[in-house]
């Protein structure tokens, strides 16, 4: 009798194990993949909000450096180790865990978000034909912000454009597509970096001109064609192109 019960128990366990294999193959509940997030227009709009937020975070870190490295502020006892290093001029270029890494990471967070918008956004026009102009405007703003980050990164991590006669010195990576976590991107010349910046700003101007303009008094807080022209003027100034 005992042997019979043991065999029956084993058979039930075996049946349960084989029967559960299909049950366990379920989608993650409460989690959204990148593809599913961008399947709706609302996801694209939320991503743009996040893009502006990440840009703000970058400049929050960027502006801190000038203040902390000057005598404009007094360091408080509860200052972070990172802030103390900047204040005491201990933030070194080779310090991969300090401020040089912080700015690099913050800027490329912005670039990554912009690349996702620019990769998935155009496909939504087929699903939302009535909102095509809104999508164009969102894409235009993303192009501008990506160009802005490439310019800021080149200012921090490269020499100025005229450092060599043909701008053949090292620029910064300019990824234009979503990347895997472990992807590596080569650093092009600064001339190639600026070529990408100018291309992004050209695309931004075209899409912003074709897209629905922002209204309601809040447009001054967002990217516009005027902002594109202003940034283009700054880029040409850095290039020494005054024509």
Identify the role of each PLM range:
Residues 1-30:
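Bacterial Sec-dependent N-terminal signal peptides
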Residues 20-69:
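Membrane-proximal, proline-rich intrinsically disordered regions
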Residues 83-157, 188, 206-209:
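Conserved, well-structured interaction surfaces
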Residues 154-161, 212, 238-241:
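Short coil/turn linking the two alpha-helices of tandem helical-hairpin repeats
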